[in-house]
Amino acid sequence: MVAPASEPSADLRPMGLEELCEHFDLSRPLAQPLTLRYELARELNHACIMAATPQSLARYMAEQLHQRGLIPVNAQVVKAVELVRAEVYELREFWSKSDYLWVPPTEYDLKARRQCDDPQTPLLLRSLAEGIHKLTEVSEESVHGAIVQVLDDYVWPRAKAMDSLRLALVGALRGVAVEAIIAFIGIEDAYKRIRRRIVGLG
């Protein structure tokens, strides 16, 4: 005997994209446990984040910024979301993936310092700081041009030079493209961060 078909559960109704993001956000308690494996849930969550508009995700980042006393304009928040969301798998990660865009580093990763620092590092960073500071307008393209010019003039090893610059800006070897970081924080802030790192090198 075949059992009669049951009525569809209310939980199976189609959900909008933003609601899906919230439903599968692993940082929020759920009324019913997910049956998906943790890794699969993270991937689904990430897919929702990548499919959502930056504007719809901006409020999650804004909440995390406000909790830390930071109140940027909405356009900045939307831009930050655009930059970092490829690295975000849970909504609560917006701060940890974008902190360096909002506040300068107060310390520098020891392993990265050992990898980047040598007697030429202060001169390298000073040259990069001066090249960036000469820019009259800031964009990823103009910053890239300034960096390439310095590296070509001094024949610095490019990979190590970019890591040294990233360490000065972020405090670790992580984050989005160096050019994108500088274009976001601005020339003056980037210059100050690099100079602070030079002073720390002695």
Label each PLM-derived region with a short phrase:
Residues 18, 38-42, 78, 82, ...:
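Non-catalytic, well-ordered alpha-helical scaffold segments
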Residues 2, 24, 45-48, 65, ...:
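Generic structural signal for hydrophobic core residues of well-folded globular domains
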Residues 11, 31-37, 71-80, 153-160, ...:
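Structural motif
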Residues 54-154:
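Small-residue-rich helix-loop
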Residues 140-201:
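Charged substrate- and nucleic-acid-binding regions of tRNA-handling and nucleotidyl-transfer enzymes
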Residues 1-51, 163, 167-173, 196-200:
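Alpha-helical recognition segments enriched in aromatics with Gly/Pro capping
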